[in-house]
From Swiss-Prot:
This is Putative gustatory receptor 59c. Expressed is restricted to taste hairs in the labial palps. In larva, is expressed in neurons of the terminal external chemosensory organ. GO terms for molecular function: ionotropic bitter taste receptor activity; ionotropic sweet taste receptor activity; ligand-gated monoatomic ion channel activity; taste receptor activity. Probable gustatory receptor which mediates acceptance or avoidance behavior, depending on its substrates. The keyword Repeat does not apply. Keywords: Cell membrane, Membrane, Receptor, Transducer, Transmembrane, Transmembrane helix. The keyword Cytoplasm does not apply. The lineage of its organism: Eukaryota, Metazoa, Ecdysozoa, Arthropoda, Hexapoda. The chain crosses the membrane at residues 4-24, 40-60, 76-96, 167-187, 260-280, 285-305, 373-393. It comes from Drosophila melanogaster. Pfam families: 7tm_7.
Length: 397
């Protein structure tokens, strides 16, 4: 029987190689990442060709500069800004992946070693569901976005326009693949956190059972407490190493995170604004037909779901750390104290969690948290309302 998740990972891996996002190979027998000559040459040629096409595109008659001069509607100016932001985000991300390639390979192999020690991570229901959902909505978002671009320009299709749309579709695909690789790495880290939580819950239950032992002068009680203390120290060591890998990943994906924030901000504004423009008049190319509006609704819904999965995955890390605190706090409900060594092990682990919490800052500009996300959504809605009001006023005049 075909393993759906393994098939999805294979498709993502080969697709990442094909579009020049991955500049190293993975041995599927061992899972080890290595930099090979053929992959390096292919990725370098692909990226250089892409940059050359972008330069030629901006020097031609249909460049962003010429379109900016000939634009008549506000939504045309806005989508040129979106295109410029997306191009800049892709180029910055690709450049980052070249000069930090050795770090990408090292963190890949380190995460792989952790997963190899805990193979139940890849067999977990949450892990499989997360990968399948991301694949479905990423494919839907990418496909519907391409169909929307072609449908909006269907009345003036030319050879130059086909090249332009193909180039923009390639950029969109590259950006989505970069986000997908970040997502897959975070899913594996969260899977490791879930295994860590399971082991900690089991240990706390065992410690609670030990509390019921009345005769504490015998050797059985001391041996059991020492055994649990050793297990807790190992769990704390696993958490420290996993947290260290997570901090390195956060530092490694700084440019990609900033690019994601900018692209998602403008794309969310653009999808709402473009929907309103399609209803107001037919200059967008959809002509407000039922099929056109249905395409907009489906494209917007899949785009938002894909974005939400990519953004929310980072918040799950903080949720797992908060859950570690709550599980350790259950120790205070025990009706009797434990052995001194086991109590010290619990206190040391709590101190480690309190002093080494994961805080993710995007290029030192702002901290990624749910409150910040709500503020960004509020800003998106406010700016979109301003654009829509301006469009309605000019449409009436």
């Amino acid at each position: 029987m075909v393993d759906l998740v393994k098939t999805i990972l294979l498709i993502a891996y080969w697709y990442g190689l094909a579009v020049g996002v991955s500049n190293f190979e993975v041995d599927w027998l061992t899972g080890e990442a290595i930099a090979t000559r053929r992959t390096t040459i292919y990725a370098a040629v692909h990226n250089a060709s892409l940059i050359t096409l972008l330069i030629l595109f901006n020097l031609g008659n249909n460049s962003l500069k010429s379109e900016f001069i000939s634009a008549r509607y506000l939504h045309e100016y806005f989508f040129m800004l979106m295109t410029a932001v997306r191009i800049s985000a892709v180029l910055l991300s690709l450049i980052t992946r070249w000069y930090q390639r050795s770090r990408f390979i090292r963190i890949w192999n380190q995460i792989l070693a952790l997963v190899r020690d805990r193979p139940q991570v890849v067999r977990g229901r949450w892990y499989r569901r997360s990968i399948i959902l991301k694949f479905v909505f990423c494919v839907l978002s990418d496909s519907l976005h391409t169909i929307s671009d072609v449908s909006a320009q269907r009345k003036r299709i030319t050879a130059d326009l086909i090249v332009k749309l193909s180039l923009l579709a390639t950029l969109t695909t590259i950006f989505n693949m970069i986000v997908c690789q970040y997502y897959l790495a975070m899913v594996q880290v969260i899977g490791l956190y879930k295994i860590l939580l399971q082991d900690l819950r089991c240990l706390v239950r065992q410690a609670e059972c030990i509390c019921s032992i009345r005769n504490r002068r015998g050797g059985v009680y001391s041996i059991q407490c020492c055994s649990l203390a050793d297990q807790l120290d190992l769990i704390a060591e696993r958490h420290y190493f996993l947290k260290d890998r997570l901090d390195e990943m956060s530092d490694l994906f700084q440019i990609q995170s900033l690019s994601m924030s900018l692209v998602y901000f403008f794309s969310t504004m653009g999808s709402i604004y473009f929907s309103v423009c399609s209803i107001l008049y037919s200059s967008t190319g959809f002509g407000s037909t039922y099929w056109g509006l249905l395409l907009i609704v489906l494209s917007t819904a899949s785009f938002y779901m894909d974005n939400w999965l990519s953004v929310n995955i980072g918040f799950h890390i903080r949720d797992q750390q908060d859950e570690l605190f709550r599980v350790l706090a259950d120790r205070t409900l025990f009706y009797r104290e434990l052995d001194n060594r086991l109590e010290a092990a619990f206190e040391n682990f709590q101190l480690q969690l309190a002093s080494n919490r994961h805080e993710f800052y995007v290029m030192g500009l702002f901290k990624m948290e749910r409150g910040r996300l709500i503020a960004m959504l509020s800003s998106v809605i406010t700016h979109t309302m301003v654009l829509v009001q301006w469009e309605i006023q000019n449409d009436e005049s």
